[in-house]
Amino acid sequence: MSKDATTKKPTGLALYTAAAEKASAVVIDQYSTSFGWATKLLGKYERQHVRNIYALVRIADEIVDGAAAEALNNYIGADPHSMVDKFEQETYRAVECGFSTNLVIHAFAHTAREAGIKRDLIQPFFNSMRTDLFQRVHDK
């Protein structure tokens, strides 16, 4: 029996995933008190997956019209569109391989792999985010 089999503390990829999921929990707690509280009605397993999805959505929104847009406002050559593209591509890569250096993307990829969330569901979300880069009033 290996040492890993006798310890309850995760190691390796499991430890990294646990840290990523804690980061996602911080995102939801900081950005949406009501949504964070609502997730407490869910079971622990479901709650974490909802947090992982919420965190990815929240960060993508920050790239488009939140903190990133604010930070890049005075930066010459700033291109939020390319930031969204890179975020999206990293998301696909992480879903495929099960790892990202971006903790929020890593946590989302863990959920996507567990729940069978594929590109056909992810891509429309990122397309929607891109519309916020150009369209400020939505009629639909």
Feature names for model-found ranges:
Residues 1-140:
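Acidic catalytic motifs of isoprenoid enzymes
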